[in-house]
Amino acid sequence: MKARVRFAPSPTGPLHIGSIRTALYNYLFAKKYHGDFILRIEDTDSTRFIPGAEEYIIETFKWLGITFDEGPYRQSERKAIYKEYVDELLNKNLAYIAFDTPEELEAKRRNIPNFQYDAITRMTMNNSLTLSKEETKKRIANSNQYVVRIKIDPNQTIIVNDLIRGEMSISSSTLDDKVLYKSSDNLPTYHLANIVDDHLMKITHVIRGEEWLSSTPLHIILYQYFGWGEKMPVFAHLPLLLKPDGKGKLSKRDGERFGFPIFPLQWTDSKTGKSISGYREDGYLPEALINFLALLGWNPGSEQEFFSIDELSVLFSLKKCSKNGAKFDYKKVEWFNHQYIQKKSDKEIAELFFHFYSKKLEKQDFKKITEVIGMVKGRISSIRDLWYETAFFFVAPNTYDEKIVQKRWRAESPIQLTELSELLATITNFSLQIVEKTIRGWINNKGYHPSNIMNACRLALVGTAKGPGIFHIIEILGKEEVIIRIKKAIQVLR
């Protein structure tokens, strides 16, 4: 049988980085077994739908280079299909209609410790099991809102076979009669739509996060109620992604707390206008992020650390996935990104840099950008870092670091830099070798201290003490720009 897996996010906001790992593992599994990878948008909860979330999902995987073989399918467009299966369960007496209001349910929760709607409590509730058929039909005809609940028999043993966690058994008495359908929006809940779609789409393996493990017994019961027990997919529940300190699941709020992105792309809240950073906007390479995420919960069984997505699709195995949660080490993803940047040519990084800062660099010479990249690439961990490291090449400093001025700008600096600018004006071949030879010869002839000249010159050209070798800076900036910057610094700092 051909392997078929799916990634089924809800359009309720930005994708958590843990969801990206889940999608990646599904993708790798499909590619390894020459199967199909399907995108299904689970938008049955209309109260949580966020405009733009589906587009965000699609854009995320486009950036990552992860392609889907089918989809996106949208559950909101499949209402009629689900209603047929709801009616089937009702006709089989495997589900029932419940009219309990939110207020009535809340009162039960307040008055009964650990209340759940199950075989014990259902006969005390406001549903079709306690009402006559006539009363039930009357309420539906009068447009009374209702839900359809699954009817779970108590004292049954549910066996869950999981590729990662092995065999587990759960008593059905611990389960509640979950809501499968709501008349308020004529949509099923996640549980019913999920099972129906997985069956109709011939999903062979359900690979999802550990948080769904507790729902699996209910899903198995639904497969059995529909008579699909023999065609049930294989389950594999992935370990949680943990906070960097290992204390609990990595949440969407942890990004601000720990100071790193939790989302693949930037997300802007349509209500508040607040933007939350993403890995793409922070200058990360998609291949670096994929490599990092692949190793969060899966081990290839070797010392190898760097994998292309094609290599991963060959090596990936659910049997090598861990049961235990994986700490999210942000320093590690920074390290991976640094390594992947070093692997690229200066031209490739320059192209990324140019695209990343297109407005700031639109008038710059691409050759100059490439030369600049070659000097600073070894020091950066993201494309965004490049602007911090190289901005002075493209934009003259408007201010000068006060601490550096006090430390490096001397009383004689204006006179010395005036002489230097006059010297530079005489150079016709402004190559690195000629510039360095000329300046060093002038320093020796004048008896100046080299560091005093170099430090003051760097301050004038850069505005602070950072940057590559001063002669490289002078060559790339060019004679005219260097002289302009020196004169400006003398005027401002005199």
UniProtKB/Swiss-Prot annotation:
Compartments where located: Cytoplasm
'HIGH' region (motif): residue ranges: 9-19
EC numbers, comma separated: 6.1.1.17
Annotated Gene3D superfamilies: 1.10.10.350, Glutamyl-trna Synthetase, Domain 2, Glutamyl-tRNA Synthetase, Domain 3, HUPs
EC class of the enzyme, as a word: ligase
Pfam families tied to this protein: Anticodon_2 (PF19269), tRNA-synt_1c (PF00749)
GO cellular component assignments: cytosol
Motif ('KMSKS' region): 249-253
GO molecular function, one term: tRNA binding
GO biological process assignments: glutamyl-tRNA aminoacylation
Domain of life: Bacteria
Residues that hold ATP according to the record: K252
Main localization (coarse): cytoplasm
Catalytic activity as recorded in UniProt: tRNA(Glu) + L-glutamate + ATP = L-glutamyl-tRNA(Glu) + AMP + diphosphate
UniProtKB keywords: Aminoacyl-tRNA synthetase, ATP-binding, Cytoplasm, Ligase, Nucleotide-binding, Protein biosynthesis
SUPFAM superfamilies recorded: An anticodon-binding domain of class I aminoacyl-tRNA synthetases, Nucleotidylyl transferase
Subunit-structure text: Monomer.
Biological role stated in the UniProt entry: Catalyzes the attachment of glutamate to tRNA(Glu) in a two-step reaction: glutamate is first activated by ATP to form Glu-AMP and then transferred to the acceptor end of tRNA(Glu).
Family label: Belongs to the class-I aminoacyl-tRNA synthetase family. Glutamate--tRNA ligase type 1 subfamily.
Protein name per Swiss-Prot or TrEMBL: Glutamate--tRNA ligase
Name of the gene this protein is made from: gltX
